[in-house]
Amino acid sequence: RTTGGLEALDDKIRNVGGKATLLPLNLAHLDEIDKLGPTLAERFGRLDIFVGNAGVLGPLSPVGHIKAKDWEKVFKINFMANVRLVQTLDPLLRASEAGRVVFTTSDIADEAPAYWGGYAASKSALNTFMRTYAAETEKTNMRINAIHPGAVQTAMMTEAFPGGPSFKLKTPEQVVNDYLAIVANNCPHHGQIIKLP
C-alpha cells in the first residue's frame, strides 16, 4: 500500500534469491493505471498473472448517510481500478501462454448486510465484471476467477471490527497457497468464485 511497503517486499524477495521490479501506482488515480500496461509491455512483453487484491472498506453506515464522495472512492478502488487494470493488462495477459487473473472478493457481495452498502455493491460489481471477462476469454488459454478467502487478518478487518471480530481469523500466509493454486497452469476453474473454507 506504500512505497516503503513495496521496498520491504523487494528486500524479502531479494533475500531469498528472487528479483522484482517495483512500479508504485496509486489506484485512486485511474489515468495512471493506463500507463502500467505499456510500461510492462516494454520491459517484459507479457504478463502471466494478475491478482486484483486492492480494496477499501468505506463507511459502514446506512446507505442514505454515505456521502457521494465515499461511494465514489469505494467504487473507484474496489471496482473501477480493477476494470482499468484489466483493460491495460489484457494484451499482455493474452500474450502469455496461460494468462491468469484472480480477484479477491467477499461473501458480503451476496449477503448484502445492513450498513455494508458501498463495499457489498462494489464487490458485487467486481464479481459480475469477472464473470463477463471470463466469458470473453472462454476460447483462450486464460483463466479468470475470484477468490473469497474468508475472514483474513488484515488492516481492513481491523477497520471493520475495531474491537476484534467474534470469529477466528486466518493469516494471509494461510491463504496464499489457495491463490497460488488458482493461478497455476493446471487450474481448471474459469469464471468461478472460489470460496475458501
Short names for language-model regions:
Residues V86-Q87, R131:
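A short, exposed helix-loop element centered on a Lys and neighboring polar residues
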Residues N53-P59:
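Conserved NAD(P)H cofactor-binding loop of Rossmann-fold oxidoreductase domains
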Residues S61-V63, D70-E72:
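Substrate-binding pocket helix/loop in short-chain dehydrogenase/reductase
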Residues T3-G4, P24-K35, A68:
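The beta1-alpha1 cofactor-binding region of Rossmann-like NAD(H)/NADP(H)-dependent oxidoreductases
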Residues K139, A146, T154, G163-P197:
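C-terminal helical subdomain
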Residues V56, R94, G99-A125, M130-K139, ...:
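Catalytic loop of short-chain dehydrogenase/reductase
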Residues I13-H29:
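Rossmann-fold cofactor-recognition segment
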